[in-house]
């Protein structure tokens, strides 16, 4: 009995050669619509789908394959006599191979001019139904959804006249992943259209971006996935201009870096980062000076770190960066001379280019945190804050220079691991205490790091001070200005201590924990 294949593809890459090889192997080919036209024009003889169903395509192609003659031919078990008899009694011919890819729903909704009606029309119904029928019956039917699998299937058919069960099972698993992702994307689109903020089912889909050598540690397996609807301002979308493949830790650190830099749009800024904590932030009127400040902030910790710049990297800045061992540099662009300098004898230095004009769209994405057996979902900490809403709670008002420095410090503290303390002036970080289990411990670390630069410095805390001992430490170090959220039941104790030492202190009313 001649074996039959059903081919209906929107992505026609490789399909002509595939179909010709099938014909050479003696297969009959059933086809639909544009695929049939393409095959016929290439000289590949095909059977029209309506010759199999006995019904014409109708309703603008919405109904063409949803028919017992198709699904019976796919679902009939070859090892069950009653199935084969039912097929014979109803003149249903078996289908042994299905090659289908789906309407381009993803590509459609990514179009800037897409309409709701156009998106709906690009939801495939018949394709997923046939794929699922064939995949369910993979004991007998080979199902192909990816042109990358054409060669494997043809090779096995040529060698043995059929594919192996292992191949059919692998391809069936691929199909179920494919249709699940396709439906998840549709669900995501409709959920956004109706504005459902807390859906009872969370369906999101990601595509494999990179198979990684290992994870956070060598004993951990890891892979990098990118959202099916990619975000332009993302490490997954960054253009790599030089260097080795990004590691798991590189990606996490780089992601933290591009999140931090979003808050420093107004002036040229350079941020150095290590283990997802900023170790140096510098702002200036030009990017070269901003680099000087970021480097000076902590010339030890920057070694082996990541640097992100929010302006084009010029030759002067590149010359200063080149001698420093860095893992990654990220910027919106690089001058030709700067790129030549940075890559000279630095084949491993990872240099990434990222469209900073797409930052705003990245801020609306939800954050996902995996826990054992569950997933936490939250908005990003991108609340708009206006310094005019802040409250000076001490007798002394901040000077103009202190006010500028406090605003800078408040931007920087948001990305320090809790309990987080940062000491800055008005253009660079000076000391950082991160990740301590008590706040006064973070205060002491930040002071120790900044001890030679405390004149005119200010201090920011990501959460309230629970006790006045923190204020005493700050005052003893010579820091004169503090910014913190407030909100402790002992706030008045801290205010009294600040007044006693002539400090100025601002309450913002907004906490910035980061775990």
Curated annotation (Swiss-Prot):
CDD domains: IMPCH
Transferase is among the record's keywords: yes
Domain of life: Bacteria
Alphabetized Gene3D superfamilies for the sequence: 3.40.140.20, Methylglyoxal synthase-like domain (3.40.50.1380)
Keyword line: Hydrolase, Multifunctional enzyme, Purine biosynthesis, Transferase
BP term (GO), one: 'de novo' IMP biosynthetic process
Catalysed reaction, written as an equation: (6R)-10-formyltetrahydrofolate + 5-amino-1-(5-phospho-beta-D-ribosyl)imidazole-4-carboxamide = 5-formamido-1-(5-phospho-D-ribosyl)imidazole-4-carboxamide + (6S)-5,6,7,8-tetrahydrofolate; IMP + H2O = 5-formamido-1-(5-phospho-D-ribosyl)imidazole-4-carboxamide
Annotated domain remarks: The IMP cyclohydrolase activity resides in the N-terminal region.
Protein name, entry field: Bifunctional purine biosynthesis protein PurH
Organism: Streptococcus pyogenes serotype M4 (strain MGAS10750)
Organism taxonomic ancestry: Bacteria, Bacillati, Bacillota, Bacilli, Lactobacillales
Encoding gene per record: purH
